[in-house]
């Protein structure tokens, strides 16, 4: 609530742009620049909301990945005996992991490699595919991955989780850039408001932990990341209409 209150105050305050002369940009000379108050520009406001949900999803997935992988790949029966997924065992022996937790950590490291690959490949793909459509497509991919994770198919669901990082890779920069489009001299204060949306990352882990403890299952707590990935999907699909509404608000 504090973050929202601060944003609400600053969105109506005219702050000086110290680089305005250097940039040589003027809202009066560029019809593409939106001069309406930020609060009246839906592509920006919903961009902040989308970033909030996405960051919550990203931090939640990062925080609970190792625990989920261990629970899904290593099944314990009532007697306490364990049944470990063959691929999990093979991967651990291949890397010389000292214990199952180390193996799970190596899997998350592989996921980080996918994240880096996705960031570069996503930037290249965005040259031929509209960024909003690419964002929506990646959001759909991650939603499907999380649904498989929530299905909790023993020895199987953990295999798809690392690919979540591949499709998360472009989300933050794409949402950030799309929400700041055509804001002109308001871009700086708008960017500051966007950065405040990362507070979502502080909210998801406690809620996911509560769900996991309440239902005695790591799988159920991934419903929060699912919601977080649906948000970029909807934002990407609706983006052209949102931008058009912002343009009309600026012209009014």
Show which residues each predicted segment covers.
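Interfacial helix-cap and linker-helix signal at transmembrane-aqueous boundaries
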Residues: 69-70, 125-126, 209-217, 221
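Extracytoplasmic gate region of multi-pass secondary transporters
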Residues: 36-109
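Juxtamembrane intracellular "pre-TM" segments in multi-pass secondary transporters
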Residues: 19-47
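A late C-terminal transmembrane helix in Major Facilitator Superfamily
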Residues: 182-217
């Amino acid at each position: 609530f504090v973050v929202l209150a601060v944003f609400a105050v600053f969105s109506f305050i005219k702050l000086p742009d110290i680089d305005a002369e250097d940039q040589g940009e003027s809202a009066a000379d560029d019809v593409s620049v939106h001069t309406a108050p930020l609060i009246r520009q839906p592509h920006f406001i919903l961009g902040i909301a989308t970033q909030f949900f996405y960051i919550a999803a990203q931090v939640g997935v990062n925080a609970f990945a190792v625990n989920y992988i261990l629970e899904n790949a290593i099944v314990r029966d009532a007697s306490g005996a364990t049944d470990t997924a063959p691929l999990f065992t093979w991967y651990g022996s291949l890397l010389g992991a000292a214990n199952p937790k180390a193996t799970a950590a190596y899997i998350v490291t592989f996921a980080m490699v996918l994240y880096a690959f996705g960031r570069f490949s996503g930037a290249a793909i965005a040259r031929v595919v509209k960024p909003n459509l690419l964002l929506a497509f990646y959001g759909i991919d991650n939603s499907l991955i999380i649904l498989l994770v929530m299905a909790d198919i023993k020895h199987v669901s953990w295999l798809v989780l690392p690919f979540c990082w591949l499709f998360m890779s472009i989300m933050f920069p794409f949402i950030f850039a799309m929400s700041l489009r055509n804001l002109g001299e308001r871009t700086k204060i708008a960017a500051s408001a966007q950065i405040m949306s990362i507070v979502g990352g502080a909210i998801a882990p406690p809620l996911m932990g509560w769900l996991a403890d309440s239902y005695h299952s790591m799988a159920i707590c991934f419903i929060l990341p699912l919601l977080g990935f649906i948000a970029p999907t909807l934002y990407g699909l609706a983006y052209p209409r949102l931008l058009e509404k912002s343009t009309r608000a600026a012209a009014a």
